């Protein structure tokens, strides 16, 4: 719900003030693609800003990133993310200098350099602050939210570790798994399953 609220705000721009909305018209597709990629893959902001156009394999629907520590990894993209990125590249990014191979570029000045980590943090904060429920949102909170939702869906901490690119599974378990309620619910469901209702007859006890 929080992810969709953030993306809806970025798509419409309605939550931004007039000045920010006017500026956002030039970067709307870029900003939306950034927010969608962060919330839809859980990648680090440093990994996102390091992506070049050539790092995207459109046929296999994967993007190459440089993980923490310098190792290369491939992150899968769903069809929606592929379409979002293609729209950004076709309708907005193509107006920039072709000599710059970075996927996400700054719209300031004439050089249109690669976006920095801090620039992306400001973009996320801008849309987060404009949405009441997400005032303190950051790229890292999007990453953590992705990891938490993936675990709730899969109940597989190893899958989450792989998706987030953690070398140590303890980091995944301690910092990205916020699932205490569902754990209790699953324990209750398991114990209930051990007691078949058809076998219970108080008269025979």
Label each residue range with its predicted role.
Residues 1-205:
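Conserved catalytic core of the tyrosine transesterase superfamily
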């Amino acid at each position: 719900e929080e992810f969709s609220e953030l993306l809806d705000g970025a798509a419409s721009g309605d939550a931004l003030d007039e000045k920010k909305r006017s500026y956002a018209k030039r970067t709307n597709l870029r900003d939306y693609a950034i927010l969608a990629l962060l919330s839809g893959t859980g990648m680090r902001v440093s990994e996102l800003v390091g992506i070049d156009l050539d790092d995207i394999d459109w046929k296999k629907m994967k993007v190459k990133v440089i993980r923490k520590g310098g190792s290369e990894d491939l992150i899968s993209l769903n069809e929606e993310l592929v379409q979002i990125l293609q729209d950004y590249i076709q309708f907005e990014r193509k107006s920039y200098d072709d000599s710059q191979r970075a996927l996400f570029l700054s719209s300031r000045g004439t050089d249109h350099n690669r976006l920095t980590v801090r620039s992306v943090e400001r973009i996320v904060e801008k849309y987060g602050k404009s949405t009441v429920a997400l005032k303190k949102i950051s790229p890292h909170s999007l990453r953590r939210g992705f990891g938490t939702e993936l675990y709730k869906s899969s109940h597989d901490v190893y899958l989450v570790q792989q998706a987030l690119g953690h070398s140590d599974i303890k980091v995944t378990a301690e910092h990205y798994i916020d699932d205490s309620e569902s754990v209790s619910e699953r324990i209750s469901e398991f114990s209930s399953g051990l007691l078949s209702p058809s076998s219970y007859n108080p008269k025979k006890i």
